[in-house]
């Protein structure tokens, strides 16, 4: 086992792409929400004097794990995920449920390279600003990516998927995908979970 200085575990080198507090250092907190079924990984982000947690939800699915709302994959975040993987199986699915939210889109390219066998599902209508670029230019591997609803939905035996929107914003659109997890009777909307 390699011992790494504590600050390096929280380091996120891509922070200039989305320069929000705490910039290059992202502490990750793992919480078990429903024993052996649902977890959250949280990091802080902020602007000026307001800092809020952002959440990636991890849900146990058939033979593995599904990640909703990707976060920047610091070593600390990956170490926490590896603990879950050792018990519950590999990351099978990564969901980006927002068309416009940068806070989750920014971590997806690096996370998809780490879990390079996971299927990626995207909210329809992905866009970037100031120039609307193709997914591959944003670092999102198009060969492993599928569009929610247009190409089906993942894990249909365990989830009911719904769309909030779309709403035209002019530059792009606002749309969020939510899901209801049948086994735990939980509703996952944005970064919120209703139990």
What are these regions (language model features)?
Residues 2-43:
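Long, non-catalytic terminal segments
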Residues 16-19, 44-48, 67-73, 96-97, ...:
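Short, flexible loop segments at the rims of nucleotide/cofactor-binding pockets, characterized by
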Residues 28-79, 175-181, 186-191:
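Conserved beta-strand hairpin/beta-sheet module of binuclear metal-dependent hydrolase folds
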Residues 74-120:
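Active-site metal-binding motif and surrounding structural segment of the metallo-beta-lactamase
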Residues 91-93, 116-119, 157-159, 175-177, ...:
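Generic beta-strand structural signal
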Residues 125-176:
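Metallo-beta-lactamase
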Residues 193-195:
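Conserved small/polar residues in nucleotide/adenosyl-binding loops
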């Amino acid at each position: 086992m390699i011992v790494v200085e504590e600050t390096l575990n929280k380091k996120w080198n891509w922070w200039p792409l989305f320069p929000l507090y705490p910039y290059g250092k992202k502490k990750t907190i793992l919480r078990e929400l429903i024993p052996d079924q649902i977890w959250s990984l949280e990091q802080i982000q902020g602007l000026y004097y307001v800092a809020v947690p952002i959440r990636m939800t991890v849900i146990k699915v058939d033979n593995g794990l599904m990640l909703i709302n990707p976060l920047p994959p610091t070593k600390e975040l990956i170490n926490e995920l590896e603990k879950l993987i050792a018990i519950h199986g590999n990351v099978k699915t990564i969901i980006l449920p927002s068309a416009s939210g940068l806070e989750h889109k920014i971590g997806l390219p690096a996370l998809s390279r780490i879990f390079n066998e996971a299927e990626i599902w995207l909210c329809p209508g992905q866009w970037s600003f100031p120039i609307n670029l193709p997914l591959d230019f944003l670092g999102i591997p198009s060969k492993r990516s599928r569009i929610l609803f247009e190409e089906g939905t993942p894990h249909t035996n365990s989830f009911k998927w719904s769309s909030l929107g779309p709403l035209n914003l002019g530059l792009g659109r606002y749309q969020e995908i939510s899901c209801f997890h049948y086994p735990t009777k939980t509703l996952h909307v944005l970064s919120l979970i209703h139990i």
